[in-house]
Each structure stands twice: as C-alpha cells, then as structure tokens.
C-alpha cells in the first residue's frame, strides 16, 4: 500500500495518541488481481506497510516502507521519507522528500521533492488535513523536471472508535513505453475500526481492522482507472 507521503498529521490517526509520535505496521490482502485478471495478472496479494511519524522542536520526520510478497518471499520494497521544518508558529512547513525502491525484476527510479506544506487541525483534533505542492525531480529521466500535489486527511468518529483517513497525489510523469508526458493520479482512503476504543477492550490492545481502496489513473495500468480494495489489520505502537 502506497500510504500518505506527507502525513504531518499522522500522530492523530491513532485517536488521542498517548505520545507525540506514532508508528504502526499494517497487513493488507489485496483483491486487485481477482478484479483485474487481465490488466494485473501478477499483482501481489499481500503487502505489509511500516510507518513512523516523529515530531521534534524543528518540525517532523515521516517515513513508510511497503513490502509486497510472492510465494517465494518478498517481491518488492518501496519507501518514502520526508522531513518538514516548521516556519515559525504558522501552519506552514518547508518539506523535503525522497522516494525510491527496488524489486526482483527492476528498480524504481529515484525521485526528489521539495515544497511547502499547509496543515489544519480542528480544535478538538477530531479532523484535519494537509496540502503540499512540490517540485519533483525524476532521476534518470530525459525530462527530469516535474511537479506533484499531495493532500492528506483524517476524521475520527464514535469517540475515536472509527477513523477515516488517507491521501491523494497527482503528479507529472513520463510514459514508460514512449517517454511522453502524462499525469498520474492516486488516492488511498482508509477506514479503520479501532478495537482498543471499544467498551471492554484493553486500551493497550492497539489493533485496528479495516480496509483501504486504491483508486488510480495512469498508475497501476497506463491510460486506465483502476480500483483495488483491500482487507487490512493494523497494530499501532
């Protein structure tokens, strides 16, 4: 699962989080291969995601690592790491980021991004969003200069028992076949039931069950919109 790039708000995705930092591990079963047998015949069924958000006096650091699995073991790994520097007491932060990874068949081209994030939180911390316009450098491309716009959001319901969160990205890229410019879109909304917020469940049993729906255009399949749902478990630390 390609999870949010700029989750400045990630600490709030675990409702009323105890420390001022957050990390989790997710396990997803992906139905994309069954739904698009012709377009995605080898799409991995299993993916794990590890995420961490850590704020400090200067801003915050966020990263995630996705690992896809085949019968033989890990098939590919992809990660993104970002650093944000607070701009005084404003809701803005300077943003720098690296994206890259590899698989047993190819390596992902490196991408380097720089931009500015705007973040908003409700006073109750029950809802919020970020938006980040960025310059994007596509390494090893004949036309490396590009752009990306990223948005993230979260909303808690039912006294923190339910969380709706996710991200949306749109960016300029190059077609793998002919090198022409194209625009890629992807969004991955997630819906979680946080079991540790239910009556009678120990709050230290920090398991969530839920789903993610990857909606993309020009991402998984060129010139086509694809919807890949998952069933998922998440343990928050």
What are the functions of these language-model segments?
Residues 1-24:
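Cleavable N-terminal export/targeting peptides
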Residues 40-44, 69-76, 102-111, 137-146, ...:
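Solvent-exposed loop/turn segments connecting transmembrane beta-strands
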Residues 50, 81, 114-116, 149-153, ...:
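Membrane-embedded beta-strands of outer-membrane beta-barrel proteins
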Residues 138-208, 214-216, 235-237:
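Outer-membrane beta-barrel transmembrane domain signature
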Residues 225-237:
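Outer-membrane beta-barrel "beta-signal"
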């Amino acid at each position: 699962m390609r999870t949010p790039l700029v989750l400045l708000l990630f600490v709030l995705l675990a409702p009323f989080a105890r420390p001022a930092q957050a990390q989790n591990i997710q396990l997803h079963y992906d139905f994309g291969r069954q739904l698009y047998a012709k377009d995605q015949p080898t799409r991995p069924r299993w993916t794990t995601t590890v995420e961490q958000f850590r704020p400090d006096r200067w801003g915050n650091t966020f990263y995630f690592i996705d690992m896809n699995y085949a019968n033989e073991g890990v098939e590919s790994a992809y990660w993104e790491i970002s650093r944000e520097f607070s701009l005084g007491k404003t809701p803005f932060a300077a943003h720098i980021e690296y994206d890259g990874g590899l698989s047993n068949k190819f390596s992902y081209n490196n991408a380097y991004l720089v931009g500015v994030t705007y973040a908003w939180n409700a006073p109750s911390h029950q809802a919020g969003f970020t938006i980040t316009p960025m310059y994007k450098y596509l390494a090893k491309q004949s036309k490396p200069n590009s752009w990306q716009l990223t948005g993230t959001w979260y909303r808690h319901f039912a006294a923190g028992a339910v969380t709706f969160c996710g991200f949306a990205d749109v960016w300029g890229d190059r077609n793998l076949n002919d090198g022409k410019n194209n625009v890629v879109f992807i969004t991955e909304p997630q819906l979680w039931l946080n079991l540790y917020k239910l009556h009678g469940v120990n709050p230290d049993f920090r398991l969530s069950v839920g789903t993610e729906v990857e909606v993309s255009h020009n991402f998984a399949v060129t010139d086509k919109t694809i919807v890949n749902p998952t069933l998922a478990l998440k343990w928050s630390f």
